[in-house]
Amino acid sequence: MASRQSQKRLTKEYKAITLNPPPYVSAKPNDENILEWHYVITGPPHTPFEEGQYHGILRFPSEYPFKPPSISMITPNGRFACNTRLCLSMSDYHPDTWNPAWSVATILTGLLSFMTGDESTTGSITTSDNVKKRLARSSKEWNNAENQRFTKQFPDLVAQNKVDVAARNAREQAAATTDSTDPEKPFDVRENIDSLDPEDRARLLVEQDDHSTPSFGVQRFTLVGVVVAAFIAAYFNFFSRT
């Protein structure tokens, strides 16, 4: 049960984090127990967690803010074991390093920083970036389908997740359809000139970019033209002297 002091402090922090949430972080207390907070971390860009959605829990002692909370993550993420207390400097593993001036925002910002790093601690796991990316991609679907605590605490995010997943699937399906077709490609003289008749060869050579580097086929065709022209010139020059 929350003390008056912890109740007052956590109520104040909820107002603060609602008005000014840290980047990639949101959090709210359980409607039935202010000592239990549910947070959501959105994977930052340019990390293996990009576009992932990670739900977890902070459990505060009644002595808060003089004692730290426990920290755990529920959504599979590839960085932390699920539903396992994490050993961080701002968690209940280290009450000796806890600072009462720290807040929920401070805790979650620190958790995000640790998550995107590679340090090891109790509760952390080691996986490849590919695994983290795969879990990030499936995280919204997992939260909606498998995470009852998430759906209870964040009904607005459940609805948004459905929209986001449907839009992503539509984009991927459209891209796959485009890739599976064989769109008409610009005619490549370098690959096809030898198969053309002389008239088409001449037309395509004229249409080529004057600044492009001639291909082997074009160079060979041009060389033949030069040789023929030289032969004709020599022929007429010979008869003009006779």
Curated annotation (Swiss-Prot):
The chain crosses the membrane at residues 221-240. Keywords: ATP-binding, Endoplasmic reticulum, Membrane, Nucleotide-binding, Transferase, Transmembrane, Transmembrane helix, Ubl conjugation pathway. Its main location: endoplasmic reticulum. It is found in: Endoplasmic reticulum membrane. Residues 5-156 form the UBC core domain. Residues 170-190 are annotated as: Disordered. InterPro entries: Ub_conjugating_enzyme (IPR050113), UBQ-conjugat_E2_core (IPR000608), UBQ-conjugating_enzyme/RWD (IPR016135). Its EC number is 2.3.2.23. Residues 1-220 are cytoplasmic. The keyword Endoplasmic reticulum applies. It comes from the Eukaryota. One of its GO terms (biological process) is protein ubiquitination. It catalyses: S-ubiquitinyl-[E1 ubiquitin-activating enzyme]-L-cysteine + [E2 ubiquitin-conjugating enzyme]-L-cysteine = [E1 ubiquitin-activating enzyme]-L-cysteine + S-ubiquitinyl-[E2 ubiquitin-conjugating enzyme]-L-cysteine. The keyword Cytoplasm does not apply. The active site is at C87. Pathway: Protein modification; protein ubiquitination. GO terms for molecular function: ATP binding; ubiquitin conjugating enzyme activity. GO terms for cellular component: endoplasmic reticulum membrane. Belongs to the ubiquitin-conjugating enzyme family. Catalyzes the covalent attachment of ubiquitin to other proteins. Functions in degradation of misfolded or regulated proteins localized in the endoplasmic reticulum (ER) lumen or membrane via the ubiquitin-proteasome system. Cognate E2 conjugating enzyme for the DOA10 ubiquitin ligase complex, which is part of the ERAD-C pathway responsible for the rapid degradation of membrane proteins with misfolded cytoplasmic domains. This is Ubiquitin-conjugating enzyme E2 6. It comes from Debaryomyces hansenii (strain ATCC 36239 / CBS 767 / BCRC 21394 / JCM 1990 / NBRC 0083 / IGC 2968). The lineage of its organism: Eukaryota, Fungi, Dikarya, Ascomycota, Saccharomycotina.
